[in-house]
């Protein structure tokens, strides 16, 4: 089964002025596409060829893992943003954030710190463990919290290709822009599932 580059859940210019059309053209159309194409080449003729993406992530390593995880991480990341995003979470998610982190502001500060201070390429995550406890963490390169038994709720890509066109080396500005488009409905859906 060949994997395909999924369409973005919005138009290329829909996240402007926070994330530019040019960034999405390169990030989605070139970087994400390259992960999908490389993954398909690597799994061709192997037992992974018929496996679902999440199983490949759990069972593989090396190049297959890196490209499978980057495909999953990016697909998830696109849905973590919306042109109607930003603002604050509500309902059960807001309550869980308050209970775990003390307040939305404290959660945002912790997540922002995790994203801004992550050394090198990787991802900042809001996850839920098997006991339903929320946690902020960062992973290096293509790592995905699923490999540690944690459920991703939200992620911010902190690879330089995610922001260099728009903010050059100013990752904090990019992370601030990310907050303006966070898709809390998607995060809530992940929290409830």
From Swiss-Prot:
Pfam families in the record: Sod_Fe_C (PF02777), Sod_Fe_N (PF00081)
GO molecular function: metal ion binding; superoxide dismutase activity
Coiled coil segments of this chain: none
Matching InterPro entries: Mn/Fe_SOD (IPR001189), Mn/Fe_SOD_BS (IPR019833), Mn/Fe_SOD_C (IPR019832), Mn/Fe_SOD_N (IPR019831), Mn/Fe_SOD_N_sf (IPR036324), SOD_C_sf (IPR036314)
Binding site for Fe cation: 27, 74, 157, 161
Reaction(s) catalysed by this chain's protein: 2 superoxide + 2 H(+) = H2O2 + O2
Cofactor: Fe cation
Keywords: Iron, Metal-binding, Oxidoreductase
Cofactor binding annotation: Binds 1 Fe cation per subunit.
EC number: 1.15.1.1
Role noted for this protein: Destroys superoxide anion radicals which are normally produced within the cells and which are toxic to biological systems.
Oligomer status and interactors: Homodimer.
Family named by the database record: Belongs to the iron/manganese superoxide dismutase family.
This protein's name: Superoxide dismutase [Fe]
Taxonomic source organism: Coxiella burnetii (strain RSA 493 / Nine Mile phase I)
Gene behind this protein: sodB
């Amino acid at each position: 089964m060949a994997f395909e580059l999924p369409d973005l859940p919005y138009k290329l210019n829909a996240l402007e002025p926070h994330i530019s059309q040019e960034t999405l053209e390169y990030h989605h159309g070139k970087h994400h596409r390259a992960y999908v194409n490389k993954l398909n080449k690597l799994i061709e003729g192997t037992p992974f060829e018929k496996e679902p993406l999440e199983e490949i992530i759990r069972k593989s390593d090396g190049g297959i893992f890196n490209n499978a995880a980057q495909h999953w991480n990016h697909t998830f990341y696109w849905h973590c943003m919306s042109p109607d995003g930003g603002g604050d979470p509500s309902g059960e998610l807001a309550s869980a954030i308050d209970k775990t982190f003390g307040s939305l502001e404290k959660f945002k500060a912790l997540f922002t710190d995790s994203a801004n201070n992550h050394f090198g390429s990787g991802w900042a995550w809001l996850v839920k463990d098997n006991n339903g406890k929320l946690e902020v963490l960062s992973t290096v390169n293509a790592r995905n919290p699923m490999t540690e038994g944690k459920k991703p709720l939200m992620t911010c890509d902190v690879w330089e290709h995610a922001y260099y066109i728009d903010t050059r080396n100013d990752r904090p500005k990019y992370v601030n822009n990310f907050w303006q488009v966070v898709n809390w409905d998607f995060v809530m859906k992940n929290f409830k599932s």
